[in-house]
Regions:
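Flavin (FAD/FMN)-binding glycine-rich loop and adjacent Rossmann-like elements that form
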Residues: 6-10, 26-27, 31-38, 42-185
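A conserved short coil-to-beta-strand element within the FAD-binding core of flavoproteins
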Residues: 6-21
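N-terminal Rossmann-like dinucleotide/flavin-binding domain of flavoprotein oxidoreductases
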Residues: 1-4
Length: 185
């Protein structure tokens, strides 16, 4: 039998002889403890492993994680706009040259929802330096500024996007790589 909880924050782990015995969690009602024979760290950032004292690395073997991305969606995009990576790069390079701020990378993807004037933009990005509340807030603020810069760049320098509107910004940045568990050495 496997139980799982949504809307829960992992806040601690108790280990005995390198084995996790209990985890401490929080939800909107307060704190609670979970005991089990086995736990699976499905946090995506090795949070349970870190709290249990496991050996971890940050990013790749050189200590460099991949960029985190904040996606956003535009509506009102013309049907015939060139959304190729080369067209995106040309527009962003030109926008940077013309002084549009907060454009951190030139290469990215814009993906159209089938048979619509709605596109998903994967451009705003940042290299994570940690996962503390302070660092997460800094990254969220920075990438949200980037969204506005990319919106201006695409409206100005990509023909067919002049009348596009910001429909939605992703709820939070998405990570590809942060902490990883070190396996058997």
């Amino acid at each position: 039998h496997v139980d799982y909880f949504l809307h829960t924050v992992l806040i601690g782990a108790e280990t005995v002889e390198n084995e996790i015995r209990t985890i401490q969690c929080a939800d909107d009602e307060g704190l609670f403890t979970v005991s089990a024979k086995a736990f699976v760290d499905a946090t995506g950032d090795a949070n349970l492993s870190r709290l249990a004292g496991a050996k971890l690395i940050w990013g790749n073997d050189g200590g460099h994680p991949q960029a985190a991305t904040l996606t956003f969606r535009l509506s009102g995009v013309a049907a015939d706009v060139d959304l190729s990576p080369a067209a995106v790069e040309r527009a962003v390079v030109r926008a940077k040259a013309e002084g549009i701020r907060n454009l951190t990378r030139e290469k990215g993807f814009i993906l159209r929802m089938e048979n619509s004037g709605i596109v998903h933009v994967l451009l705003p990005s940042i290299i994570p330096e940690g996962l503390s509340a302070e660092e997460m807030t800094r990254m969220e603020r920075e990438t949200r500024k980037q969204v506005l810069g990319y919106l201006q760049a695409l409206r100005t320098y990509m023909p067919g996007m002049e009348h596009s509107e910001l429909a939605v910004i992703g709820p939070s940045i998405g990570f590809r790589e942060t902490r990883k568990l070190v396996g058997k050495e």
